[in-house]
């Protein structure tokens, strides 16, 4: 197999792990595209993306156009003479002229089993929906949003204790090896592109802080999924004692909840059981404002008066109540 001349486009840590795999492979990374440096930290100093930092460590030329829609940026990219462009969480739209520039086009690493969960938050939405599995899809990019032909897919069972953070780590391990395997198939001409079935497609909408507020009227099963899906961001939470309480770990209890949704049924070292629309959600690890995340047993030692059985927790905004 003749090594490929690769352009890589990506920005966050997830992308950097794929770039590292390419650097370690027999292929040649001839250039890296990453989003412009952004202000970060308390001093708001400009900070390079993880992808840019890794590229500079290996003396790989870095390009940071604000857009790839202008002709100068497109001409600069074309002049590099890449065989293929690998795109992983880049964050900029690639116009058709860019998709057509490399000899083998552009391929993307997407964090779901396409065509399910196209879009911005596939890992989180798989948890949110209660999917049994997720995975990585390597696809040939076209002008649509994650609509290109699929080249290779991996599968990863979703476990009960998985969160978005843990799935992110698992897929960040699966993705690079899948990418290297797909590049080998493309170089040898042994891959058969598989069109996506539009009837099976759905979209992973971006997450919002508002969506992460717990609504105790929902079934405990759904709230449990949300706690896992929104960990680490935006973190499931509910208002109580004029504070926003974050929930990092919870479980479902089948104990009958005769009380109104949001009522604390019990509070002990096993957790705080809260009545929901169906069953009870047991809060196991929570975080009070200005504090670290703590096991409920430790929280109760310090703030047991906040969580006495019979207490009614908020979790529905007035606007929600008006619509109910």
Curated annotation (Swiss-Prot):
GO cellular component: cytosol
Gene3D superfamilies: Formyl transferase, C-terminal domain, Formyl transferase, N-terminal domain
S-adenosyl-L-methionine in keyword set: no
MF annotations from Gene Ontology: methionyl-tRNA formyltransferase activity
PANTHER family: METHIONYL-TRNA FORMYLTRANSFERASE (PTHR11138), METHIONYL-TRNA FORMYLTRANSFERASE, MITOCHONDRIAL (PTHR11138:SF5)
Domain of life of the source: Bacteria
Keyword Manganese in annotation: no
Residues reported in the UniProt entry to bind (6S)-5,6,7,8-tetrahydrofolate: 112-115
This protein's UniProt keywords: Protein biosynthesis, Transferase
InterPro entries according to UniProt: Fmt (IPR005794), Formyl_trans_C (IPR005793), Formyl_trans_C_sf (IPR037022), Formyl_transf_N (IPR002376), Formyl_transf_N_sf (IPR036477), Formyl_transferase-like_C_sf (IPR011034), GART_AS (IPR001555), Met-tRNA-FMT_C (IPR044135)
Protein name: Methionyl-tRNA formyltransferase
Assigned EC number: 2.1.2.9
Role this protein plays: Attaches a formyl group to the free amino group of methionyl-tRNA(fMet). The formyl group appears to play a dual role in the initiator identity of N-formylmethionyl-tRNA by promoting its recognition by IF2 and preventing the misappropriation of this tRNA by the elongation apparatus.
Name of the top EC class for this enzyme: transferase
Catalytic reactions on record: L-methionyl-tRNA(fMet) + (6R)-10-formyltetrahydrofolate = N-formyl-L-methionyl-tRNA(fMet) + (6S)-5,6,7,8-tetrahydrofolate + H(+)
Gene: fmt
Species of origin: Shewanella loihica (strain ATCC BAA-1088 / PV-4)
Family listed: Belongs to the Fmt family.
